[in-house]
Amino acid sequence: MIQTKYRIHFFIASLLHFFIFIPFIVQKFIGPDWDSYALLGTVMNLYEDSLYLPSRPPGFPLYEFFLTFIYGLSNYLNLNFETLFLISQFIFVLGNNFIILNFFQKQSSQRIFLYYIIVFSPIYLTSGLSVIDYHAGLFFGLLALYL
């Protein structure tokens, strides 16, 4: 668990990410990356036709099946699937923020500015605002290293 002195950094980073995230969720913009649209095509094929065509070689079936479940849930609940995809992406970003901060706490690091450099780097932000598997993969990779 994060100590109190580190907790504020998690909340600051997460709150700033949330404010950056708001326009994307309002516009239901799944991202500038073409891989996001390929992933969406895979999800729709899998859900509607029960046909798995990888979004890109070699395919990322775990994340594609996860999004297919969310797509089905959105149809069942009559919700917009882009919104649910983006919310799930944001949850992975928050999880990554939490685990990265735990690495700094585990090392008793006083260089917390490095945490902010990591979580506000352009590639971290861009991939966090696109419906793509980068943050999901990062989450499970960091979790494996942390545990």
Language model segments and positions:
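Short helix- or helix-capping micro-motifs
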Residues: 17, 114-122
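Transmembrane-helix motifs of polytopic, lipid-linked glycan transferases
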Residues: 83-109, 140-147
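Hydrophobic core segments of transmembrane alpha-helices in multi-pass, intramembrane catalytic enzymes
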Residues: 39, 63, 93-97, 118, ...
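Short hydrophobic/aromatic helix or loop-helix immediately within or flanking a transmembrane segment
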Residues: 42, 53-78, 87-90
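Membrane-proximal lumenal/periplasmic loop motifs of glycosylation machinery
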Residues: 24-32, 47-68, 82
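Short acidic/glycine- and proline-prone juxtamembrane loop motifs at membrane-interface regions
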Residues: 34, 56-57, 126-136
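Membrane-interface starts of transmembrane alpha-helices
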Residues: 5, 76-88, 110-114
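Transmembrane signal-anchor helices characteristic of membrane glycosylation enzymes that use polyprenol
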Residues: 5-36, 46-48
